[in-house]
Amino acid sequence: MADFDAVLKCWGPVEADYTTMGGLVLTRLFKEHPETQKLFPKFAGIAQADIAGNAAISAHGATVLKKLGELLKAKGSHAAILKPLANSHATKHKIPINNFKLISEVLVKVMHEKAGLDAGGQTALRNVMGIIIADLEANYKELGFSG
């Protein structure tokens, strides 16, 4: 619970501008891990040079961060939020679980740079994302998806 609270203390700047922060997160993910861009069919054809500032990427990044905000605010009681997310990402989008680990590390970096997430907050965010990803992976296994 303390880890969720530590992360939520720095969540304000994210909530204040989901679109910009989401764009920063996905842009960095695609630049640091170009293979992840292929997992998003609508972004697959966007050249690396055109990723930053792309409105569609920023909009999807906002969607990702809004859902993460819901998960954070649930403080671990997130089964009802996570189950449909796991279902769509396993059965429709086919997103391997490792990609959630990659975006988690990108999020740690962006929140450190843009939201003042200190070393303790970074550890807390890694812990929280570890919990969420473990639960997501358990849902994947229930669905028979070995992503």
UniProtKB/Swiss-Prot annotation:
Main location: cytoplasm
Any GO BP annotation: removal of superoxide radicals
N-acetylalanine found at: 2
Any one GO cellular component localisation term in the record: sarcoplasm
PANTHER family the record matches: MYOGLOBIN
Annotated binding of nitrite, by residue: 60
UniProt family annotation: Belongs to the globin family.
Functional description taken from the UniProt entry: Monomeric heme protein which primary function is to store oxygen and facilitate its diffusion within muscle tissues. Reversibly binds oxygen through a pentacoordinated heme iron and enables its timely and efficient release as needed during periods of heightened demand. Depending on the oxidative conditions of tissues and cells, and in addition to its ability to bind oxygen, it also has a nitrite reductase activity whereby it regulates the production of bioactive nitric oxide.
Name the record gives this protein: Myoglobin
Biological source species: Thunnus albacares (Yellowfin tuna)
One family name in Pfam for this protein: Globin
This enzyme's EC code(s): 1.7.-.-, 1.11.1.-
Binding residues for heme b: 89
